[in-house]
Each structure stands twice: as structure tokens, then as C-alpha cells.
């Protein structure tokens, strides 16, 4: 989750988010190099006294400033396209989770098991415990096993919502009458926080998401206890 005074991206808890962070750093380095080059050229242009009244054309420099940006865009576009295809790829998910957005809470259904469904509301400030986070903790967490491929299907019953967990690199719109899906792979245990990322009404800010990642053995125990 985002911590106080942190200006960076959240730590990646999935291979996809780690790839997104790497792509961000890769693109940022290219942009810094471009900024330094353009700044150097502008400073030289403004502060030198050289004048050439007979310069009518410069085919070589025009060729350079046409080819260099094209090559730069290729170095940015290829990793970006690779990530876009990875975002849409589903790799034999072990579990399917269905998330339904409401004004202003989430409902969850475990499609692979019978009668495992619940609503997830934000815990009001007056009912919070000492170690819980304001506006982020919920009464019913999503329990998922780590080191397994998870598919999530998202929809809504009223207005457009957006199911988002930044540390997993997941952001998917919840549209009424439409079922969207994506997948993620959690590679470590812990709690991962998210929120609705589409303005959906007066209490839009009060639709948090909490995923609790546990081992597969503990997940099976949780399924058995919930079913019984």
C-alpha cells in the first residue's frame, strides 16, 4: 500500500506489476536523456553569438532529427506493446473470483465453490481497531492463495465502478450489463489495498478493496471453514 510521503509507485506484489515498474523506469531514463539534450541545445542557441546568414538548408541535420525520434519511439513502444498483451493474457487460472460493484460497496463470489459469497463494506472510523487503516479496511477481506493464477471477473449493478489494486497492477472497469475479466498472480503473502477508481457518486471514496494473500493450505482451510 502507499505509505506516508511516498512519491514512488507501490512495491510490486505480482510479476506484472514488477514489469510495469521496470517499464516506467526504462521510459523515465529515455525522457531524462531527451530533456537534457533539448535543454543543452536551447541554452546553446540562446547564449551564443554565431550567425549564419547563408544557411538555407541542412539535409543531414534534418535527417538526424527525423530518424532519432523514430528510433526512440520504437524503444518505448515495443516494451509497452508487450505489457499490453500480457495484461490480456489468461494462463489457466486456478480460481475465478467475481466482483460486483454497488453504490457503495463490493460483492464477491467464488465461482469454483458452492455458497461462498459475501459483501465487503468499508469499516467506519468509529468502529475501527487500533491496527486498521482509515478509509481502507473492510469488514470482509478477499482471501486468495499466493503463487497461483487468479482470474477476476468484474461487473456492476448500478453505475460504472473500477476495481483497482495498485500493488498487483490491476485496474479493470465494472460496467453494468457487461462482464470484464483480467488475471493476476500474487507472489508473496500479505494485505494489499485498493479502491474504486471511477467516480461513482457521493460515497465513491468509501469503496475500499482488501486482498489477504495466504498459502494454498491455509486457503483450503478457509474454504472448508466458510463452507461449513
Swiss-Prot record:
InterPro entries: CcO_II (IPR045187), CcO_II-like_C (IPR002429), CcO_II_C (IPR034210), Copper_CuA (IPR001505), Cupredoxin (IPR008972), Cyt_c_oxidase_su2 (IPR014222), Cyt_c_oxidase_su2_TM_dom (IPR011759), Cyt_c_oxidase_su2_TM_sf (IPR036257)
Organism: Yponomeuta malinellus (European small ermine moth)
Transmembrane segments: 27-48, 63-82
Protein name, as recorded: Cytochrome c oxidase subunit 2
Keywords: Copper, Electron transport, Magnesium, Membrane, Metal-binding, Mitochondrion, Mitochondrion inner membrane, Respiratory chain, Translocase, Transmembrane, Transmembrane helix, Transport
PROSITE patterns referenced in this protein's UniProt entry, alphabetically: COX2, COX2_CUA, COX2_TM
Family note: Belongs to the cytochrome c oxidase subunit 2 family.
Subunit text: Component of the cytochrome c oxidase (complex IV, CIV), a multisubunit enzyme composed of a catalytic core of 3 subunits and several supernumerary subunits. The complex exists as a monomer or a dimer and forms supercomplexes (SCs) in the inner mitochondrial membrane with ubiquinol-cytochrome c oxidoreductase (cytochrome b-c1 complex, complex III, CIII).
Amino acid at each position: 500500500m502507499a505509505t506516508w510521503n511516498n512519491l514512488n509507485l507501490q512495491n510490486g506484489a505480482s510479476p506484472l506489476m514488477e514489469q510495469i515498474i521496470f517499464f516506467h523506469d526504462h521510459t523515465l531514463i529515455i525522457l531524462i536523456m531527451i530533456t537534457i539534450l533539448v535543454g543543452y541545445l536551447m541554452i546553446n542557441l540562446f547564449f551564443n553569438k554565431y550567425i549564419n546568414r547563408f544557411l538555407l538548408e541542412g539535409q543531414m541535420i534534418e535527417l538526424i532529427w527525423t530518424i532519432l525520434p523514430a528510433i526512440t519511439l520504437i524503444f518505448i513502444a515495443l516494451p509497452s506493446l508487450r505489457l499490453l498483451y500480457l495484461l490480456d493474457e489468461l494462463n489457466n487460472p486456478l480460481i475465478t473470483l467475481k466482483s460486483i460493484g454497488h453504490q457503495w460497496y463490493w460483492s464477491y463470489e467464488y465461482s469454483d465453490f458452492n455458497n461462498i459469497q459475501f459483501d465487503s463494506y468499508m469499516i467506519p472510523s468509529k468502529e475501527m481497531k487500533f491496527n486498521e487503516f482509515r478509509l481502507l479496511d473492510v469488514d470482509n477481506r478477499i482471501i486468495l492463495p499466493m503463487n497461483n493464477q487468479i482470474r477476476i471477473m468484474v461487473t456492476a449493478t448500478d453505475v460504472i465502478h473500477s476495481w483497482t489494486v495498485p500493488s498487483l497492477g490491476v485496474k479493470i472497469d465494472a460496467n453494468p450489463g457487461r462482464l470484464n475479466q483480467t488475471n493476476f498472480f500474487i507472489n508473496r503473502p500479505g494485505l494489499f489495498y485498493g479502491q474504486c477508481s471511477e467516480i461513482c457518486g457521493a460515497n465513491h471514496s468509501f469503496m475500499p478493496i482488501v486482498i489477504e494473500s495466504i498459502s494454498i493450505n491455509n486457503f483450503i482451510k478457509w474454504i472448508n471453514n466458510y463452507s461449513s
